[in-house]
């Protein structure tokens, strides 16, 4: 690809960043579509995010992806949030229109699209959702919008727990879905929740390098063949949770599905053009 002075820059702001497949995926898509943009990853955390956003404006970047740990903080630095992003309380995409920043969240729509593509109808179903960060809450919000009946969210009693409670309140007030929040340490409640769930979704970084040998499921007997298990982590591709689920006979959806579909929506928001889906799936080796 020959980059000229006419090219615009799109970024990804996250920490850590080296594991991300987004730069490779987006640049392959941009090159295939023949569009004058280049996508670069920048190591940015909560302490440098404000400066990075000022840099985005100063450099007239077209926009940026936002990943851990910046997704919730990023809401404070945009001029406008979509209704879904307000419900989530986190964004993963910023579009810069001449200095006016719009915040979107494509994590939820991407993950739910991957579930739909598998043939699973979530309407009226119950989900156990692990985590309360930006990705997890985005998935929960979109699932509620799409008609899921109940979400049982489990998170450790950390800084995200109160945010999870606030998220549940927003969803309960604005949708027909019922969201409850429980401490992940409450194994009795967790066991009961899984026994009646239709979907188990991991929205945490457990399973991601360097936590690739870990899973939040300590007792694999909790996994049943009729349970759909979905994963946000894509590096490694086959997380310990997915291995446990497949051994238990569960249908699974790996993290590539979310990466692909959320990235496709980001691409279209930044460029206004269709994402070359089939080409990207082929060159990236995605099974989703």
Curated annotation (Swiss-Prot):
Keywords: Amino-acid biosynthesis, Aromatic amino acid biosynthesis, NAD, NADP, Oxidoreductase. Substrate binds at residues 71, 107. This is Quinate/shikimate dehydrogenase. GO terms for molecular function: quinate 3-dehydrogenase (NAD+) activity; quinate 3-dehydrogenase (NADP+) activity; shikimate 3-dehydrogenase (NAD+) activity; shikimate 3-dehydrogenase (NADP+) activity. NAD(+) binds at residues 132-135, 155-158, 205, 232-235, 255. Homodimer. The keyword Cytoplasm does not apply. Gene3D superfamilies: Leucine Dehydrogenase, chain A, domain 1 (3.40.50.10860), NAD(P)-binding Rossmann-like Domain (3.40.50.720). It comes from Salmonella typhimurium (strain LT2 / SGSC1412 / ATCC 700720). The gene is ydiB. CDD domains: NAD_bind_Shikimate_DH. Coiled coil: none annotated. It comes from the Bacteria.
